[in-house]
Amino acid sequence: VYDYLKFQKQKDKALNTLKASGSDLRTYWEFLNDSGYEYDKVTPKMIAEFIDYLRASDDDVIALNKESKRTNKTINRILSTIHMFYQFEADMQEIDNPILMHDVNRPFNALKGILEHAKSDNKTKQSIFKVKESDYKINLVTDDEMELFLSRLDKRRDILLYKMLYLTGARIQEVLDLEIESVPLPDMSQLVGCFRQIKSKGKTRDLYVPMSLIKELDDFIMEERNLIDTDHSYIFVSEQKRQLGKQLTYRAAYDKLKKVQEEIDVDFNFHDLRHTFCSNLVQSGMDVSVVRMIMGHEH
């Protein structure tokens, strides 16, 4: 990344352009790290995951059908930065560019007067991942859709993972980072319990969880998770032989999400679950300041 930005600086790119490129690539590397991917082995399928990741990063919104913090225009700019980075890497190290391009017709009004003679060759390159630059609407998930989704999961671990997302509004990485010692003792005389000071975007916050779900987690830990020997205490770990005991990755959770969705024809991403939970709180008449506290918003 340093070499690429240095190359861009040598081409007299504006300082703001260099800052934007650095920010875009930092976001991309955060996704790679969260997913366990290596930058030189990224495939087009992983780029599609990255687009979902970008959309799911809108965390500080409380409104029904609010547009994403990252507009589709911003997402396209980030993809353009990554495409140019891989073009540079392809020249330097012969790394394949995972952002595939195809030929498209230029819109007529994009032709300037001096280019009128070139209309017969009116083609330009465009990423196959380019998203429509209109407001991205959050998809609210119904109880029936979620029950159908959960019914198709075959692992107790996965059912609990997605219940945590749907019933608490937690971010996916917050759930993946939950540790056994953070689980409060089940007290069925209470409706809600609190996971104190969980990891959240480089900081910490409290996570409020239905007591019935805390009981399910506690039973799962005692009956299944504790049977897997690890040198860490993450609740959600891989159960595959080759990766046994390693912290469950964003990639694994994403793959499971998409696999089940293909079977039931119900489409949503991780952040849709968070936004659905938030929207349900707002619709119930809860004070917005309380909703912000529950969702872990700073302001």
Regions found by a protein language model. Name each.
Residues 21, 161-162, 169, 173-178, ...:
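Alpha-helix N-cap/helix-start motif at helix boundaries, enriched for small hydrophobics
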Residues 254-293:
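Short, basic (Lys/Arg/His-rich) helix/loop patches that form interaction surfaces
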Residues 133-172:
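Basic, Lys/Arg- and aromatic-enriched nucleic-acid-binding interface segment
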Residues 2-16, 25-114:
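N-terminal core-binding DNA-recognition domain of tyrosine recombinases/integrases
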Residues 173, 177-215:
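Conserved tyrosine-mediated DNA breakage-rejoining catalytic core shared by Y-recombinases
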Residues 97-143, 239-244:
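Flexible interdomain linker/hinge and immediately adjacent N-terminus
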Residues 146, 157-159, 250, 254, ...:
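Short, leucine-enriched amphipathic alpha-helices that occur as contiguous helical runs
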Residues 211-266:
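Active-site/catalytic core of tyrosine-dependent DNA strand-transfer enzymes
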